[in-house]
């Protein structure tokens, strides 16, 4: 029996495994999927999770709950030795384990791209995982509670200052959603005003949303600025140490919440720990039919798709173009990969990946959005509805579609839930505190400890000396 190993349970990996279960006959192949989590995260919904418009668990699809004929292993693939048909996996107990296979499917996805900027490691939160979206929401909600206790001034404004680094879809969407959340929360905090909010979007390029054309991109900039946001284009963050943002323009300001959404980096298992061919960006070289290799040098029994693969875009007007790493492509590549794998096992012809874009749509907060399909551009409320309609259809399984719809309906009727869940991160705190709800996890009262951003000004602090290499 053919042993198929799928590395990664994101869009491409999940849909490939799901498709194989539907198409393979009994006893035709033994499929194993390895992923650090027991679920697939529908990442386009993470900005709305961060803003409290969607419940965190509703954007997660259980792998074991839907892949009944696939062996699911909770672990991190650390290396792939295709010459010997083995992969090394570090399971949840920390022990390394070798898995033998006949055919491998590499769908490990990408990681957040970082840079050696002082303070990023200590201050920033990414947005590729549900845990990060929940942490962003909790930090902003908690900041409102703390700010309401302070008099108007620098301290209050610093707590309610949000900086998002990255002007792609993830960065712009979470920026718009958090701006919408913060503005709506002012109704529940009469002590605060719109002047206390300070939102900054920073991108090194001269424009945002590179997936849309210039004029829609400029419209988004104008729209966000009208809502009181500050956009710093053609600008880089040179330091985020000690809760203070310093920009390449020389501007600096105190910051409360820093979100890093500056694009994707190659997955380490693909970039550095495999004998499969990779390109200069650390992506697996893939043919149009999703086999690993090139037309001149195919690699037998190896397939790849999704964000960790350089998949040729046959629909692009530019020769040699690669498919954009997004959910739309990853889902369709995963479905085709399952079809091609089964066809290859049965000695039939495989098909090239050819997908014409259905358009580009982004949320900018409740009631705000933008959609573009070729020359057609729709903005505002209709585009926001299109965003929700498209993604509720795209999220896998009817169970998840219904749950998301119900949450949206309840939010329309009752408004967004603004209760932070930060105490969930310290489940034993109340037990150790002996009934004092304000005691910390060690039983100590937080009033005796400085809050994360109650820090001295830069001239009173030593320079940061440890910087992490770019990932």
What are these regions (language model features)?
Residues 7, 99-109, 237, 253-263, ...:
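Short hydrophobic core segments
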Residues 1-79, 162-163, 169-212, 385, ...:
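Beta1-alpha1 glycine-rich phosphate/pyrophosphate-binding loop at the start
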Residues 122-152, 243-245, 252-332:
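FAD-site-proximal beta/loop scaffold in flavoenzymes
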Residues 12, 109-112, 175, 264-266:
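Short glycine-rich anion-binding loops that position phosphate/pyrophosphate groups of nucleotides
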Residues 71-163, 259:
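FAD-binding core/adjacent interface of flavoenzyme oxidoreductases
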Residues 329, 333-471:
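C-terminal, flexible cofactor-proximal segment of oxidoreductases
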